[in-house]
Amino acid sequence: MLFRSVHHIVARFSNSTSTPIHRFFYSPSLLRRRSSFNASLISRCCSSVSDVDVARDAVVKIFSFSREPNVVQPWQTTEKEYSSSGFAISGRRILTNAHVVGDHLYLQVRKHGSPTKYKAEVKAFRYGCDLAILGIDSEEFWEDINPLELGGIPFIGETVYALGYPRGGDTISVTKGIVTRVEPQKYSHSSIKMYVYTSGGSTNKFYSGQINKKIYDGR
């Protein structure tokens, strides 16, 4: 959305092994529908420019391939490619939006600064909070990737950085903003009310799955 204030969906998760993933997510086969809503994920990060550079290396570009019917000749289908963003978390996993992967034939993921694409699989999935976890079975992919830690929630007036892949671009973008509003709003996929953050500042039109980073103690 090309508004000065862009809405960002908030999701809180724990990296603790005592909290099983299945408590938050459903199987990928339960819900499969696509949405044009560009959602975002909130986590905390570190304060210096060098720390933002480290965080940038954890952000990946996701390529989703699907088949869509021809409206004129519905017996024919066409393969479509979509791209979005995600980021590495603990356990060799990628966190992104559910609507990014909800109707895919196959997925590929590319690291920042690399031309190589790696096959990815959906490991956990839930439209209620519009989040999905991907797995990548490649030792090479996980080399030199420092996963991000999911931390607390930023407050109004605090600085955040939006990292992702804007539409029409193939390189990662970093945008600085200020949290200007926090309020519950309906998610476009489930119509469930959850907290949504508004950040002010100059923003690009981001692909889904981007990360917004609060500057705080390496999270």
UniProtKB/Swiss-Prot annotation:
Region (Serine protease): 61-216
Classification of source organism: Eukaryota, Viridiplantae, Streptophyta, Embryophyta, Tracheophyta
One GO process term, biological-process aspect: proteolysis
Cellular compartment(s): Plastid, Chloroplast
PANTHER family associated with the record: PROTEASE DO-LIKE 10, MITOCHONDRIAL-RELATED, PTHR45980
Alphabetical keyword list: Chloroplast, Hydrolase, Plastid, Protease, Serine protease, Transit peptide
Major site of localization recorded for this protein: plastid
Protein purpose: Putative serine protease.
Protein name per the record: Putative protease Do-like 6, chloroplastic
Similarity-based family: Belongs to the peptidase S1B family.
Enzyme class: hydrolase
Transit peptide: 1-45
Active-site residues (renumbered): H99, D130, S208
